[in-house]
Amino acid sequence: MKGVSAAFTAPAGLSIITTTFAEGPARNKALSVYTATGATGFSLGLVFGGLLTEIGWRWVFFLPAPVALVALLAGIRLVPQSARPRFSRAFDIPGAVTMTGAMLLLVFTLVEAPAVGWTSGRTLGSLVGVAAILGAFVWRERNTSAPLVRLGILRSGSLVRANLAAMTLFGSWVGFQFVVTLYLQQLRGWSSLETGLAIFPGGFLVAILSPRIAPLIMRFGVTRLIVAGMTLITAGYVLFLPIGLDSSYAFAMLPTFVLAGLGFALAFGPLNVAATNGVAPGEQGLAGGLLNTSFQFGGALVLAVVTAVLNANVGSDGSPQALLDGFHAALIVSVGAGLLGVIAMTQRPVRQVQAQPELEEAFEEAA
């Protein structure tokens, strides 16, 4: 239920911003505030989530319900109504089923591969199945009058690079946070609250700095900010690699969370700008949906790889050092994902979107 709800609300929220504010300083500022509010919620969630688990884990799922109700009522009251479309559009159920099926099968295959073997018939057959389902999705989108994803939008170099960077940015962080949580709670014996407080500085920096990123977007452009942000985040992961069984928080962990906070503040807002600049108003929801799908799929994909690497490298004796060795190997996955994001953003687009006359100029501004 939460996943379906997020699939409806996240792209809609981004679309409301991009269709309400014109490209340029106003939209950049709005997206910076959007990033800051998300980071604030993330930071507070770490702390309050830890507190609530001290009462009982069910409270972690119950408390968001009244908060969501208040947000819904506020949205009905404050968000301006958009004009209804002049024509109704069919929903592409086959496209949604094939795309979702391909992503689920890929993640499942990566999770199960260490147990059944990377070259086993089951693993190879599943990968062939992923390719076949993706082929069916592309065929469907090319041959239906109401596609889930208009494939022509992928001619936008800025949008494609932003989505690749989103996958690696969020994926690397999800994988890193997974390993850090296991490290702190299993090896160091920290509570959920202590773990949340340990990670809190990163989210706090994002919440404080994100509203101030808009002027930097106008001065340096989104590509440079995204590359700088992802470089800082990846450097933070590298600093965490030598972590030991008794490493101090202040010197061995805090620098990573500070760099991650600075990096997210620099990269997240510009990613939203790069993914939506130059897109026609009627496709802002599609662009937002693609970006949020990239965030979520990247998180699931990298986490699956992290889990596979962790399980493959944990020693059989179950000693603390054996667990630590597995954590070190898994952290390399996040480093690699971060580097891939930097590489993706430094590649120049081959083609630009041709659906609207003004798009070429818009994408040059985004770069």
Language-model segments: residues:
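Short helix-kink/termination motifs in transmembrane helices of multi-pass secondary transporters
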Residues: 60, 100-109, 113, 171-182, ...
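A gly/Pro-rich, aromatic-decorated transmembrane alpha-helix motif that marks the paired
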Residues: 36, 40-55, 104, 108, ...
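Signature tryptophan residues that serve as conserved aromatic anchors
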Residues: 57-59, 118, 190
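Helix-loop-helix hairpins in multi-pass membrane proteins, especially solute transporters
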Residues: 1-94, 281, 285
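C-terminal membrane-cytosol helix-exit motif in multi-pass small-molecule transporters
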Residues: 65-84, 100-112, 129-144, 341-349
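Membrane-interface helix caps and helix-loop-helix hairpins in membrane proteins
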Residues: 82-88, 113-119, 246-247
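12-transmembrane solute porter fold
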Residues: 13, 121-129, 133, 139-317, ...
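Intrinsic disorder in cytosolic terminal tails and internal cytosolic loops
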Residues: 85, 347-367
